[in-house]
Amino acid sequence: MPKMKTHRGAAKRFKVLKSGKVKRSKAYKSHLLTHKNAKRKRRLRKATYLVGGDAKNIRRLLPYS
């Protein structure tokens, strides 16, 4: 059986931790930031985790992580 390929788009966006959780960064933080207040931009800096079926799907795309 051939090697499974890693989905490169998913590899750039997600990180699978030792615990099995899938870490991701938040959207809406790249441009058009002048009208967003400081509190909102500060909250967007923090990473968050995928839950349930979403995490399972991403883990399937990243077989060697």
UniProtKB/Swiss-Prot annotation:
GO cellular component, one term: cytosolic large ribosomal subunit
An annotated Gene Ontology molecular function: structural constituent of ribosome
A single GO BP: translation
SUPFAM superfamilies the record matches: L35p-like
The organism's place on the tree of life at top rank: Bacteria
Transmembrane segments: none
UniProt entry keywords in alphabetical sequence: Ribonucleoprotein, Ribosomal protein
Annotated Gene3D superfamilies: 4.10.410.60
Coiled coil spans: none
InterPro entries: Ribosomal_bL35, Ribosomal_bL35-like, Ribosomal_bL35_CS, Ribosomal_bL35_sf
Family listed: Belongs to the bacterial ribosomal protein bL35 family.
Entry protein name: Large ribosomal subunit protein bL35
Organism: Thermoanaerobacter sp. (strain X514)
Lineage: Bacteria, Bacillati, Bacillota, Clostridia, Thermoanaerobacterales
